[in-house]
Structures are given as C-alpha cells and as structure tokens.
C-alpha cells in the first residue's frame, strides 16, 4: 500500500450528481488536500444497462462547479474508466481460476430464481448453493460439457470460505466484522458479458492505483467483506475503509429519497437556480462532519485546513433545505455586488427585466436572496400586476387610520417635484405624515408599505418607493384608497 495518502471518487455515469455522491467526493477531496495527498477521479462504467449518455461529463462539470480539482482523471490519464480496463480484470480473473480460488458457474438465471423461491418458502436465507457439490470430477466434466453444448455462457464465481472472518477498523464506525457464512455463498466476479462485477473491479482498481483510503457512504458496508475476500485471494493489503453515515431528511427523519420534493438533491438544480457554489460546498461539508464550535460559515481553504477525519459523525446527517437556504442567503448577502449581479443577470434577461433599473433592483433585493432566480418574483412589483393581498395584509389595511395615512402621504409625494423626488427625500415625507397625523410606528409604516408594494416585508421602504417612481407609487396608493 502506498505511503502517500491517495483517495478516489469513483462515480458511475448513470445520471446527475446527487447530493450524497457530491458529499462522498467532497470528503475525499478535503481529506486528500488536508494531508497533501492525491485526489483521483475514476469512472465505474461496467453497468452498461444503467449508463447514461453524457453522464460522465455532467459529473465532472458539477464537481468543478463546486470548486473541486483533482490530480488524476480520465481527462488526463489513460484507462481511468473501468470499460477501458477489461484486459486488466481478465488477467486477475484468470489468475484466480488457475489457482482454484474462483470457478466458472453454469447455473442459469431460471435455476437461480427457482432456488431462491424454494429457500424463501422453506424460511431459509437466500444464498447461492455451489452447483458442483457432490459431483465427481467425471460428473463435473460431463456437466460442463453439456452446459457448454447448450450454449450456456458461464459467469465466474469467487470461492467463499464459509469459516472465514472478515473484519476491519472503520475510520468512522470502529471495528466491524462479518462471517463468511453470512455473505450469501460464492458470488459472481465476472458476468456473462465478460464485464467484472463492481466488488471485484473496485478492488483491482484501488490496488493498481495505490488507493490508501476508501471513504464512502455506509450503504457500502455490506460490500466491504466481499472486497476483503478479493484482497485476501490475491494476497494484497487492503486500504483503510471509512463509511460515512446516511443522509436523512430533517423533516421526516428517514433516509433522503429522490422522491422528497421539499429538497433540492442534485447539484445541477443548485446551479440552475443560481446558488453560489461556495455556499453549496460549505453546506455539504457539514453533512456528517463538523470542526467543533458554533461557527458554520467557512471558505474552501478553511475547510481544507480544518478537516479532521476523526470528527466524522457516527449519527445520520440531517439534510435541512432551510439551513441550506439560510447559508446561501448569508453568502449572497456578503458577496460582492458584481458576483451577485452576474448570477441574477440571466434570470432578469429571460424575464425581460434587464432594464436600466436592473442593477439597482439587484442591489435592493440582494440581502433577501437565497438563490439568484428569486430576483424575478421579488421584482414583480416593478413589472407585474399588483399582487392580491393576503388575509394578514387585509387586516392591517382595515384599521380606521389607514385612509388618513395614505391620503396625507400621497399629498406629500405629489408635492415633490421630479428633481426633489430622491431616495433621501422620501423618509422625511413619511416623518411629516407622522407629525401631521400623530400616527406612528407600524400603524404608519405598514399601510404605506402594503399600499405601495403589496407586501408586509421587503427592502427599505424609501428604496422601494424611489425605484418604483413617484407616478407609480401614487397610482398604487390611489388604487388602494379606492378599495378601502
């Protein structure tokens, strides 16, 4: 095993980059960068049925968007896709066959299904029963000849030691142990199409690439004993394994499911909605790990420096969309204006709102944004029809002082010339209404805000009125007075 730390992220090109896979990549990235090691990207594409066109490009593109870089990948190195390494796998399959540690299996899918059904009806744990048990060498040869004559293509199975014990000290979960008798019998290492199975190929790849640490989700725990069997059969030292806990939905307490519509689970979705990649990186880094303390906002460089594998959580990581949005808002609020405007610009352009007021509008709503696409609904006031009032807003506007407040404020606005109507002159007009009517606080500000914007909350009221313009503000107040 290599002395230098080498980790890998090995996705299958079967679709978009999910938040769970992004976390696996990110933790491997942080671990490698923290220790000055190598971060390797390898593509596991042996499952041809699930292969998605452009899946590999999508994975790498979204990892780059998150801010990760890598030392080795299919882009820079030959044979970093499993489909390009079939000769390598065959070499080790042939070795195991020659050493009697693996054998060709001619049992058909129909026979396997029938045996599983029998075992289930008998209340037995489903497992593969070696088809050659009880056969003499002559009978075995006749059986193989008969099957080959019938055109049956064999798989290759690894011979499992039923008495074997497979254990490791997990980086996250501590000591874990499996008995060979609980593995399910001899398992397939090469399919009928000549492709290796996942648990075989991954061992060959990790060994040849000198991977020192395998950090992955705990759904892979059941794969680990099978992989340890291959390491043992080939006489190789296994890497260190670390299995991160599940990600659960914070609202349901259950494993995060792609059917959970209250969460954004694919990195592509965050890109399309205009989240800052730094915010998404920060959020994912805290899913199952934390550096201690109360602070939650960290730059990529800080996370690399702080990352400590000993602080990987043993409890499930709760995916909280509200927390993601809170964190995103914090990043957008504190980002420079040019970066935020660049994120908002495509959404404004698509909505036909890239006007001379666009920069002012982004500046106005920047503190409220959780994602850049929100700039469109937030600016509806300036481009769309006046919104219907909510019940809470109607209740505010039902107060008997409202007509007085609106009428007097309207007079103050109308009295301002175009030159006098500036952002700085609006607040004094509101204070003048207070002085003239004796009405103050929420009873003063809230009716004006609702009459002008149709909302109880928003940016500073003078900013909204100034950007809306005197004429339109007066029009909105007139319309509201007519409804009272």
Curated annotation (Swiss-Prot):
Pfam families: Anticodon_2, tRNA-synt_1c. Coiled coil: none annotated. A motif ('HIGH' region) lies at residues 11-21. It is found in: Cytoplasm. Disulfide bonds: none annotated. Keywords: Aminoacyl-tRNA synthetase, ATP-binding, Cytoplasm, Ligase, Nucleotide-binding, Protein biosynthesis. One of its GO terms (cellular component) is cytosol. It is an enzyme of class 6 (ligase). It comes from the Bacteria. The keyword Protein biosynthesis applies. A motif ('KMSKS' region) lies at residues 255-259. One of its GO terms (biological process) is glutamyl-tRNA aminoacylation. It catalyses: tRNA(Glu) + L-glutamate + ATP = L-glutamyl-tRNA(Glu) + AMP + diphosphate. ATP binds at residue 258. Its EC number is 6.1.1.17. Belongs to the class-I aminoacyl-tRNA synthetase family. Glutamate--tRNA ligase type 1 subfamily. This is Glutamate--tRNA ligase. Catalyzes the attachment of glutamate to tRNA(Glu) in a two-step reaction: glutamate is first activated by ATP to form Glu-AMP and then transferred to the acceptor end of tRNA(Glu). GO terms for molecular function: ATP binding; glutamate-tRNA ligase activity; tRNA binding; zinc ion binding. The lineage of its organism: Bacteria, Bacillati, Bacillota, Bacilli, Lactobacillales. Monomer. CDD domains: GluRS_core (cd00808).
